[in-house]
């Protein structure tokens, strides 16, 4: 998803 909390993931 992304690189920042809470979207940590691909």
Curated annotation (Swiss-Prot):
Keyword Protein biosynthesis: yes or no? no
Please tell me where this protein is predominantly located: secreted
UniProt subcellular location: Secreted, Cell wall, S-layer
Source domain of life is: Bacteria
**What keywords are annotated for this sequence in UniProt?**
Cell wall, S-layer, Secreted
One GO cellular-component annotation of the UniProt record comes to:
extracellular region
The job of this chain, per UniProt, is described as: The S-layer is a paracrystalline mono-layered assembly of proteins which coat the surface of bacteria.
What is the protein name given in its UniProt record?
Answer: S-layer protein
Annotated organism of origin: Bacillus thuringiensis subsp. galleriae
């Amino acid at each position: 998803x992304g690189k920042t909390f809470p979207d940590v993931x691909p």
